[in-house]
């Protein structure tokens, strides 16, 4: 795929990534000028998960934008968030392979952003799983932090029609004729497996954070991912925490600490 010719706003803010078949909504947070160190800054792409509820205008966007602003302010990094196809103001329809392609575009965009010297990725739930996959496939990614990430998506593929119906209900499949090929759509759910790719990331940095009481993705998934990376990970299990860790102050503190420990 040819990288899109996109220049995010110099001072940060919302912008669009226009591609041949879709437009992706994105947001860039920059630290205050006083936080700059050296000639370049580290960059982080933050990925959201699969929505649990029908969309409320810009609600999820605001939450991730606020997280990006905080991370940039606290760490001095340039932080980019992306709305995957079918979510928020991004066009298109959900497919797992499509979301992974969107993340790869975001990595390209951030790497080409003036002032960014290297890129890490971070994600929550499905976004964390895709962040692992992207890091496993792209050696330019310097490290990954994944929160509540599933080890694979095989359970979704077992009843693809039901999952399509769920995706329609939460608004990430908008075209009534999509997917044209249900089996090909479901095949991506079986073949895109963080469990198969996380072992390609070390010695690059990996942070896995999971809630001990996660009611959606078992904490066993985090332990399986850690084992698949030959235990070359920082694994943190948060007592009493459930699935949604984006607003858990302990999870955010772990992310900020991990970012601060990344080398030049």
Where does each model-flagged region fall?
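Alpha/beta-hydrolase active-site loop
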Residues: 63, 93-114
């Amino acid at each position: 795929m040819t990288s899109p010719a996109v220049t995010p706003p110099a001072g940060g803010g919302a912008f669009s990534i226009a591609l041949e078949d879709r437009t992706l909504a994105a947001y860039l947070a920059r630290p205050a000028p006083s936080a700059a160190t050296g000639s370049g800054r580290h960059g982080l792409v933050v990925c959201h998960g699969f929505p649990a509820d029908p969309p409320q205008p810009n609600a999820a966007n605001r939450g991730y934008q606020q997280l990006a602003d905080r991370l940039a302010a606290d760490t001095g990094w340039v932080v980019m968030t992306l709305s995957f196809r079918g979510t928020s103001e991004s066009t298109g329809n959900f497919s797992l392979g499509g979301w992974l392609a969107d993340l790869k575009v975001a990595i390209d965009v951030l790497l080409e952003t003036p002032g960014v010297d290297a890129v890490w990725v971070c994600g929550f739930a499905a976004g964390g799983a895709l962040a692992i996959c992207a890091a496993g496939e792209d050696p330019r990614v310097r490290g990954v932090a994944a929160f509540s990430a599933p080890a694979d998506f095989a359970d979704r593929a077992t009843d693809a029609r039901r999952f399509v119906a769920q995706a329609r209900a939460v608004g990430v499949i908008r075209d009534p004729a999509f997917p044209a090929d249900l089996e090909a759509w479901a095949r991506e759910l079986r073949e895109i497996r963080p469990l198969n790719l996380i072992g390609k990331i070390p010695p690059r940095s990996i942070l896995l954070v999971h809630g001990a009481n996660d009611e959606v993705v078992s904490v066993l998934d985090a332990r399986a991912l850690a084992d698949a990376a030959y235990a070359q990970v920082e694994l943190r299990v948060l007592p009493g925490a459930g699935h949604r860790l984006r607003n858990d102050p302990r999870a955010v503190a772990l992310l900020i600490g991990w970012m601060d420990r990344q080398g030049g």
